[in-house]
Amino acid sequence: MRTSKYLLSTLKETPNDAEVVSHQLMLRAGMIRKLASGLYTWLPTGLRVLRKVENIVRQEIDNAGAIETLMPVVQPFELWEETGRSEKMGPELLRFTDRHVRPFVLSPTAEEVITALVRNEVSSYKQLPINLYQIQTKFRDERRPRFGVMRAREFCMMDAYSFDIDKAGLEKSYQAMHDAYCKAFDRMGLEYRPVLADSGAIGGNGSQEFHVLAESGEDLIAFSTESDYAANIEKAEAVAPAVERAAPTQEMTLVDTPNAKTIAELVEQHGISIEKTVKTLFVKASDAIEAPIVALIIRGDHELNEIKAENLAEVATPLEMATEEEMRELIGAGAGSLGPVGLKLPFIVDRSVAVMSDFGAGANIDGKHYFGINWGRDVELGQVADLRNVVEGDPSPCGKGTLMLKRGIEVGHIFQLGNVYSEAMNCGVLDSNGKNVILEMGCYGIGVSRVVAAAIEQNNDKYGIIWPDALAPFQVAIVPMNMHKSERVQEAAEKLYAELTAMGIEVLFDDRKERPGVMFSDMELIGIPHTIVIGDRSMDEGHFEYKNRRSGEKTPVAMADIVEYIKAQLE
């Protein structure tokens, strides 16, 4: 490809609204352009990378035995009503009506559509197992699109769906897709980890996320220091403390704390250790209990894990905090003064709080706290659960080592759905005994467009992108110095371009009438792995200059050897 015939569209300056490195570089390298909030046009350079990710994913998913299909982006709303997800998805599900006032949605995922298809097309166990996938545009009406294509409203995704006669078959299909993901991300040259995850709105019995490790990642991942255990912080279990609760050494006393509205203020003003304080959070209760509010009690230095809270039968989904008005109506006090002593509402205590003694908490009276609280003596302990986020140094749930935390970008997710959707939509087949059996489903997603951004977050420097070879928009750049003033430089560049192109190598030939500095900057910004510089001075010495984008090393290569040298670099 000649730059004179190509839409290069590089930018010198970083746009002000680009927060993360990948967004900045994708705009500057001419990969994408913003059309509206969360909506992007993919320019030729970006599309070349996107297609490479697609092709690697397609090859590995094909190798795992899945079959490609293509489903509509527009889906009938009634399908979503069949599974009950029409409400669970919330406002992210974009709904609209056609001219006949029939309700539809823009597809964020396709469990309902594929289940309806299999329900109609597969009738016998002899047709199983089957795994169908597509690579297609999806739409989620994100409330706050940000970070470019990392969290866009419209995005490209590979979504696959397996159907098996039993759980053993599902586990086999799930493992095959797990292995296919690993092979795909290995080929892309990414540093990634599969981690245990919550199933969220998709549902099902078990799931894993695939995270590209990057400091800009939105997710925190917990890793064991001595095993291969890894989990999203939403899923990582906070192991119950191994110590027994100490015996009381203090009497419970009521203390005036008019200026202590937060744990930090309480600690600073009254000299109590933060590990000896608790936070009492009021959340909306589910229909499983009669009370409108349930209290969740965690240690003062810990954070509530909202996913763990939502998974409690007593807590409404999605998690919703009680308002100040609701707190005052129920107990007569507001946030900052709440606690378990004398509380007339159901409460659930975190494991770490259950072993505390002589601790401080709000007295359910504005501006007052109790110090020296002890379970059993001053208040009954009641229900205990894992409510908090893990922190570095916590024991690993696997029993080996402690936990360390790193940030990651989720690029893939696999689920063992079981019969959540197939049962709701009556998707079954006749087994070998002629009995109708509801199918076991798995679903699998890779954010193809997000992989592009994640790869940049992991591979960049101050000059621009450093693509892994498998993802680069072009494999080789040819930069002829002052080509339009030197006939022999032009002839050498044209000859080399023709030779490399004939070999099937993807080459970007910079034939613009530009200063060499501009040409070098653009090639580094775009991130082409291998650059050949052709100039009069080097030709006088009988060589071209080869530059490796990742290492930055420059190597003189004899003109007669350059083709074989490049072939060796690409192997």
From Swiss-Prot:
PROSITE patterns: AA_TRNA_LIGASE_II
Bilayer-spanning residue ranges: none
Keywords of the record: Aminoacyl-tRNA synthetase, ATP-binding, Cytoplasm, Ligase, Nucleotide-binding, Protein biosynthesis
Assigned EC number: 6.1.1.15
Subcellular location(s) per record: Cytoplasm
GO BP of this protein: prolyl-tRNA aminoacylation
Top enzyme class: ligase
Pfam families, alphabetized: HGTP_anticodon, tRNA-synt_2b, tRNA_edit
CC terms in the record's Gene Ontology section: cytosol
Catalytic activity, as annotated: tRNA(Pro) + L-proline + ATP = L-prolyl-tRNA(Pro) + AMP + diphosphate
Subunit structure and binding partners: Homodimer.
Family: Belongs to the class-II aminoacyl-tRNA synthetase family. ProS type 1 subfamily.
Function: Catalyzes the attachment of proline to tRNA(Pro) in a two-step reaction: proline is first activated by ATP to form Pro-AMP and then transferred to the acceptor end of tRNA(Pro). As ProRS can inadvertently accommodate and process non-cognate amino acids such as alanine and cysteine, to avoid such errors it has two additional distinct editing activities against alanine. One activity is designated as 'pretransfer' editing and involves the tRNA(Pro)-independent hydrolysis of activated Ala-AMP.
Protein name from the UniProt record: Proline--tRNA ligase
Organism the protein comes from: Vibrio vulnificus (strain YJ016)
Name of the gene encoding the protein in the UniProt record: proS
